[in-house]
A protein has these predicted regions:
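Low-complexity, highly charged intrinsically disordered N-terminal segments
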Residues: 1-5
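Glycine/charge-rich, flexible interdomain linkers and switch-proximal surface loops
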Residues: 6-28, 274-284, 291, 364
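Acidic, glycine-rich flexible loop/linker segments
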Residues: 8-13, 18-143
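Conserved alpha/beta-domain cores
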Residues: 106-395
Length: 395
């Protein structure tokens, strides 16, 4: 790897091999240089793995690495979790054919661009895309997503070596809103902590960071940091259709505090004659606590977005970063599906729409189940949008 984050010392495109890659490093990889990456540490449920899927980079994470890999010809099979070295002619032909079949499937799916995302009985679903930044927008548009259901704003912080200013954030949010041309853009406020670390914030190392000082807890503890981001988002809302969602909510008190800070930000902007749009406020449902009081939370916000990755981790008491637990980490667990159903029911009782923005939203084996539960929106990796649309149109 090069001296700068995300750079690769090679003229030719390569398969990048590393002991580990942090989300902040992954998001800066140059896709023209990195065909794929393989790491020894990590888990397929980590944010690094999720980013690889968002960026459409084949990856193997948490695998044994043979020695002396540099310069070798290799095949990365992300579907089967295989690293194949010095493949014979038969294996090469097999993967060439597989690649051609995949390209053919992509071409067929392109016929669904411009079509409604609705079931055979006419039930419409809002099908949005998850992004980490501006670089993902081309894929969102190419795959005809109806909007952005999750803009992971933390990558503005992870990609920088200092705190992004209000102006820097405003320019990015405004550009995304304008590019989406009136389509919904839901920005998740700063969600760092756990495996997403920002050195310049000087956060203390924790024994159990997934349950520690992270996400909304940081924002409410450091209101000026929070207000800077909120000001930037509200200013950008004048130029498009923006919603805001807040991560890691566990109580009504948090929402009330958030609303107080939002009111202060809006008052400040008004006092300075700065225009802003009508912004929908929602929360992530990613803790069992939020699920259990979702009837009360629904009275306070306009939408829920279910983060199935963390909801699975916290419900099953299972570290999503630990590769030894991958076979036990089961988002299909009946407890998870019951929690999703409960959240939908409680949301709808109070006219609160409900979506899923976790990886489970793109699980085609559950699409019909989610529709029967009454899910209003699915937000998925851009490359999965047309596949999910195809599945929904056959239900």
């Amino acid at each position: 790897q090069g001296k700068e984050k995300g750079t690769v010392d090679s003229e030719e495109p390569v398969i990048l091999v590393a002991e580990d890659l942090a989300p902040s490093e992954t998001v800066q990889l140059d896709k023209s240089k990195v065909l794929s990456f393989v790491t020894h540490k990590g888990s397929t449920n980590s944010h690094t793995a999720i980013l690889a899927r968002t960026m459409n980079i084949p990856a193997l994470i948490g695998v044994e690495l043979p020695e002396n890999l540099e310069g070798k010809m290799a095949i990365v099979d992300g579907y089967e979790g295989k690293l194949i070295l010095d493949a014979d002619e038969e294996t090469l032909c097999y993967y060439e054919k597989k690649k051609e079949e995949e390209e053919e499937e992509k071409k067929l799916l392109l016929n669904l661009k411009g079509k409604e995302t609705e079931t055979t009985k006419g039930k419409k679903i809002h099908l949005y895309a998850n992004i980490g930044g501006m670089a993902d927008l081309a894929s969102v548009l190419a795959n005809d997503a109806a909007g952005i259901g999750l803009f992971r704003s933390e990558f503005l912080y992870l990609e920088s070596d200092k705190l992004p200013t209000e102006e820097e954030q405003f320019k990015v949010y405004k550009a995304v809103a304008e590019t989406m041309a009136g389509k919904k853009v839901i920005i998740r406020t700063l969600d760092i902590g756990a495996d997403k670390k920002v050195d310049y914030l000087n956060l203390e190392a924790e024994e159990n960071p997934a349950m520690g000082y992270r996400a909304i807890r940081i924002c409410l503890d450091q209101p000026e940091l929070f207000k800077t981001q909120l000001r930037a988002i509200y200013r950008a809302s004048y130029y498009g259709n923006i919603g805001i969602m807040f991560p890691m909510i566990i109580s009504l008190e948090e929402i009330k505090k958030i609303k107080e800070i939002v009111a202060e930000v809006k008052a400040e902007l008004k006092d300075h004659g700065i225009l802003y749009g009508d912004v929908e406020l929602g929360i992530m449902i990613e803790t069992p606590a939020a699920v259990m009081i979702s009837d009360k939370l629904a009275e306070e916000v306009e939408f829920f977005s279910i983060g199935t990755n963390d909801l699975t981790q916290y419900t099953l008491a299972m570290d999503r970063q630990n590769p030894k637990l991958e076979s036990f980490y089961d988002p299909h667990h009946e407890a998870i599906l019951r929690m999703i159903e409960m959240t939908v029911e409680n949301g709808h009782k109070h006219q609160c729409w409900v979506g899923i923005c976790g990886e489970l939203g793109a699980d085609l084996s559950l699409t019909e189940t989610f529709i029967h539960m009454g899910i209003d929106e699915l937000s998925v990796t851009p490359s999965m949008v047309l596949k999910v649309r195809d599945t929904i149109r056959k239900i």
